[in-house]
Amino acid sequence: MNEAIEKRISHRCFSKEPVRASDVLQIKKWTAEVNEESGLDIEYLADGSEAFNGIKKSYGMFSNVRSMLVMKGFSDDETLDVKIGYYGEDLVLKMTQLNLGTCWVGGTYDSSSFSVPDGEALVCVIVFGNIRKTIKDVLIRAVIRSKNRKSIEERTVADAKLPEEVINGMEAVRLAPSAVNRQAPTLRYAHGQISMDGDASFKFNLVDLGIAMRHFEIGAGAGNFELKNGGLWTK
């Protein structure tokens, strides 16, 4: 998974070649396992392109969007956004290992295109597909990869020197996707305890928190977070 973290960047333009049937079956299997474990209702769509027809906003134009995961769950679950980020990013990294391109999409789509059962909430979608490899796409990816990333010091509050495994975890957090590049989740190290929290005033900060928690666990090579704002990390 560490290699997938290093490799992953956001892709908004895909080739017209459909995702291989064997990869689709694997993604469906992973999604079912995640739903069983988490209580989420993540839905695979072979063609959700209708939601992106005519969409061109601040994140740039999407092209050849078809396959996606619709990220939803029970609306009365106070930890829904954190869970969506955590389990969704686990799926993103697994799809990266399949050499597929992925992108978290928070608002640049027509939400009315999706079916959401009563009692559930649509949080976001993850689009994915085969990576388009034009010169323009290569240049765009170079710009994305070079985006300014906050230092570990800017994203931690600590009362002592950070252990090596925590530093490794935070290096992985620095490579996590973040809504409008806010990089908001903060790690706190106090009295030997580790927790992570995010400012809930912005809609997608708690999704980012779940994403960051999963990256930290992989980078640290051990432990699990409580999946909530301010959740503790235990080994």
Language model segments and positions:
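Acidic, surface-exposed loops and disordered segments
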Residues: M1-K235
